[in-house]
């Protein structure tokens, strides 16, 4: 069997979409295992950019694309995305949805907006797309699943029950107008009609493929430091984008995972609120943002930029049991002069080589840096590792040494062809 998992090792936006697109050329299945439409991933094919939110990055390849049980789905967003890429010539008949995946409802989106606007509440920087409230209903056993859309009587009962409770909250606590049952029911009845042919039990299908030694690629959204358990809580997402999340989010045994592939940007970025120890503020941070095009694929929000944080990198490598690292955007560092990598934090006089659980302590953390010589050459057209500038290779080798995990692929540009394969994945 060949189960490959691709995860982000930082705070997202590492370039997972591009790498998954490349790897999926040989994949029989590409399986999305968590998250929703709260993150965009970008795939560039022959200079043409595709921005995806719900669909797996492998949708532009021939393998079956699975939206797994651990994903939460806004049917409107799903259908809009299908329509958008079909209009650009892509086929989508190979896209299927797990009948166990949960459905984002209008009251989830409304609740998300309310919670983010409450004055005394910590501002997480949510995308306000209903992801968190949908997962909350899932955990409290009040969720509506894709299988419910195949049984309209059951869907009607669950919607009526949930809407009564949610409208009590909207009207009595927040003084808002109630949401209308008939409007929502008819809207989602229409969605059900359009997507019912895609809703299947994906678990036996994916496991059978693995048992037959087919290549199955598991794709996570967001990244390690946004994980609900191991990220910079509470500035995290509502699911587990780690390798461990694959087993519950796709319905497979951990014994069926052969490779853990961590995607790591050559510097660090973060969107929204939360601690960021290696953040570079001011003109130099703006320069990196400009060169790297560090703006949200969907929201357009500027990303915070900083030096490569290998405290985070080590943490991600260990927890995910990574076998390979894909280093992206190394080309952005060309011409920046001296480069820094963070190897430890100093917090209240104590050296930390691991990410502490106390998020507030990270606000006091002082990064301990190693400084390396940079390079000035344009490396975007280089195809062989040995052709990279000496200092670029030294940078990569030092990162690899600190992580204790091989860098197998280096990305030197946004197009799927701009990769240097050091060792086969």
Curated annotation (Swiss-Prot):
It is found in: Cytoplasm. Coiled coil: none annotated. Keywords: Cytoplasm, GTP-binding, Ligase, Magnesium, Metal-binding, Nucleotide-binding, Purine biosynthesis. Its EC number is 6.3.4.4. It is an enzyme of class 6 (ligase). Mg(2+) binds at residues 13, 40. Binds 1 Mg(2+) ion per subunit. Its cofactor is Mg(2+). It comes from Fusobacterium nucleatum subsp. nucleatum (strain ATCC 25586 / DSM 15643 / BCRC 10681 / CIP 101130 / JCM 8532 / KCTC 2640 / LMG 13131 / VPI 4355). Pathway: Purine metabolism; AMP biosynthesis via de novo pathway; AMP from IMP: step 1/2. The gene is purA. It comes from the Bacteria. This is Adenylosuccinate synthetase. It catalyses: IMP + L-aspartate + GTP = N(6)-(1,2-dicarboxyethyl)-AMP + GDP + phosphate + 2 H(+). Plays an important role in the de novo pathway of purine nucleotide biosynthesis. Catalyzes the first committed step in the biosynthesis of AMP from IMP. GO terms for biological process: 'de novo' AMP biosynthetic process; IMP metabolic process.
